[in-house]
Amino acid sequence: MQRRQLLTTLTLVSTLPIALPVWAQQDYSKVEIKAEKLNDTTYMLVGAGGNIGLCVGEDAVFIIDDQFAPLAPKIKAAIAAITKKPVQFLLNTHFHFDHTGGNEAFGRDGALIVAHDNVRRRMTADQLITFIGAKQNASPKAALPVITVAAEISFHINGDEVNAFHVPRAHTDGDLVVHFRKGDVVHMGDTFFNGMYPFIDTSSGGTADGVVAAADRVLALATDKTKIIPGHGPLANKAALQAYRNMLATVAQRIKALRAAGKSDDEIVAAKPAADQDAAFGGGFIKPEQFVRMMLNAIPK
């Protein structure tokens, strides 16, 4: 039942480069949603798929992303254990199914869904996510963002100023990063995979330079005490984001240099330009050779 529910959103395309990540294939009945308190009003919820941000307080319940559709009841239960108020605002960091799967359930409950302009555009039509081999089917009306933003938007709730800003052509063409100014928390969505090689969705407008630029923007506003919620991986700090940014910039520069020297894509892969990064970042669902091939697509020729 759980897998059938997911496949109403996804169609797998077996001829494409890699299998769907393990967190999109698991038995959702066994997933536990765990909450980590970051400050008096802000939490990170972890289950399967993208990490969720939660802001509670006297004004409203505000969440960032909502993982997979089959997990919506568990996510609601985890929120209800923290606050009895309904979710009023739901912000999507981008359109991917592991961050928007619960939209329909929350939308039908009355949550106002907020996202970048390109997220709504992509969610209204079928999307081919080439690198992970999946077609994301068009979303029902209740799952669509009702408020869209081109550049940035602010929410003044629960004693905080929550600023969501667009980072162009990063993980996709519709990424929002969310900064809790007073709480000193940042949710980066999939512009940040903590401790692992990232997935950059080049078929949806993503670029390596855009991911580096997104990291640079957050690094400029972060302090050593800032808590950073990545799209995937454990809670991070500024040092972890700096290491991730440096890895991406270093590998990108090496690939650009090899291209400038006339090397073919296969020769660049054989040169292993990320080999010294594999120990620190190669343990995620994007494996070292896949990462280099993805970077070849994510760096314009």
For the regions a protein language model found, what residue spans apply to each?
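N-terminal secretory signal peptides and thylakoid transit peptides that target proteins
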Residues: 1-18
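Accessory terminal helices/loops
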Residues: 16-25, 220-225, 234-301
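Conserved beta-strand hairpin/beta-sheet module of binuclear metal-dependent hydrolase folds
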Residues: 34-78, 176-180, 185-188
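Active-site metal-binding motif and surrounding structural segment of the metallo-beta-lactamase
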Residues: 35, 58-60, 70-114
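Metallo-beta-lactamase
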Residues: 37, 60-61, 68-70, 120-250, ...
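Divalent metal-coordination and catalytic microenvironments
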Residues: 41, 55, 65, 79, ...
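Solvent-exposed loop/turn segments at secondary-structure junctions
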Residues: 49-52, 61, 68-71, 95-100, ...
